[in-house]
A protein has these predicted regions:
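N-terminal loops that bind phosphate or other acidic moieties
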Residues: 1-345
């Protein structure tokens, strides 16, 4: 199911680091941008990596656990927001236009049947998950199928010359599934990794935590088996994003991880295949409390902290600008010798 993840290219990494030391600036003066450029080289295997073709892949799926009152918004908003994406009217569309990135929308588990149209990939594994408070959200086979969808979508994008990919999501109730995954895989109590999602009040938050506790008690997901956790308390769109991560890493494409939902997918992916970790770039620190726990567990430092909690891939696409800047610095700055500028003595 999982393609072989190639190791980082240490020669390209060393060449990029060496070039950074010759550019017309004090070594290390551009901080994280220099680190990013070296990481891009190691991932892509190119000492002078380019970031031209960019895309955000949005996996969409519904959650049966919404029936427990864990979301401030109704389940039908998943379908409605997918249509909004297709019309170009969502936050991710505006930000992707600014970043000159494509928006790829994938129905991997929307409860409603969507009509075929340009810009939408119909790859439905199921009409949403089942209510995880009563039993497994999906079967293990369904989780594997959704992962395969994500990998296949990236395969198609890679054939177009994709240089950089962001993970995006749409699914009412998916912060509940993500919190359950985080609790199961980190061992943290649900209260420590569960936030207000799209805007729950105090009573709603307490109900959400109780539902997650019940789901974990009912399903007993095995923390030693991330696929078991994913299938029992996860979501189809989260599984799809696991596949996006695997597919990108297999093709040496850097993966920009968005917020809490994408972080949960990254936690599962890294639990299944540790070798994906170096391919991940954490875009931002989400307001969702569990996101910090996930990033710490993955050993990732976010590039941005803007108080975001929307999802859709918005934070990841904002980070595209910094990542492209890192590549441009490495590729376009002159060396001391080229510029005729004296280096330090």
């Amino acid at each position: 199911m999982i393609s072989t993840i190639p190791p980082l290219d240490l020669a390209a990494e060393a060449a990029a680091r060496a070039r950074q030391g010759t550019l017309t600036k004090p070594s290390g003066s551009l901080g994280r941008l220099e680190e990013l450029s070296v990481q891009l080289a190691a991932i892509t295997g190119e000492a002078r990596p380019s970031v031209v073709d960019k895309a955000v892949i949005i996996m969409a799926g519904d959650h049966g656990v919404v029936a427990e009152g864990v979301s401030a918004y109704p389940a039908e908003d998943t379908r409605q927001m997918v249509l909004n994406f297709l019309r170009g009217g969502a936050a991710i569309n505006a930000l992707a236009r600014q970043a000159q990135a494509r928006v790829v929308i994938v129905d991997v588990g929307v409860a409603a049947d969507l009509a075929p149209q340009a810009g939408l990939e119909l790859r439905k594994v199921a009409h949403g998950t089942r209510n995880m408070a009563l039993g497994p959200a999906m079967t293990r086979i369904q989780a594997e199928e959704a992962i395969a969808v994500g990998m296949q979508v990236v395969e198609g994008e890679a054939a177009r010359g994709l240089d950089l990919v962001a993970t995006g999501d749409m699914g009412i109730g998916n912060t509940t599934a993500s919190a359950a995954i985080a609790a199961a895989l980190t061992g943290c109590p649900p209260a420590q990794v569960t936030g207000r999602g799209a805007g729950l009040d105090d009573a709603g938050l307490a109900r959400k935590i109780a539902v997650i506790e019940r789901a974990l008690a009912v399903n007993q997901p095995d923390p030693r088996d991330p696929l078991d956790v994913l299938s029992k308390v996860g979501g189809l769109e989260i599984a799809g994003l696991v596949g996006v991560i695997f597919g990108a890493a297999a093709h040496r494409i850097p993966v920009v991880i968005d917020g809490f939902i994408s972080g949960a997918a990254a936690l599962v992916a890294a639990g299944l295949v540790t070798d994906v970790k170096p391919y991940l770039i954490a875009a931002h620190q989400s307001v969702e409390v569990g996101h910090r726990v996930i990033l710490e567990r993955l050993g990732l430092r976010p590039l941005l902290d803007l108080g975001l909690r929307l999802g859709e891939g918005t934070g990841a696409v904002l980070a595209f600008h910094l990542i492209e800047a890192a590549a441009r610095i490495l590729n376009e700055m002159a060396t001391f010798a080229e510029a005729g500028v004296s280096d330090k003595t």
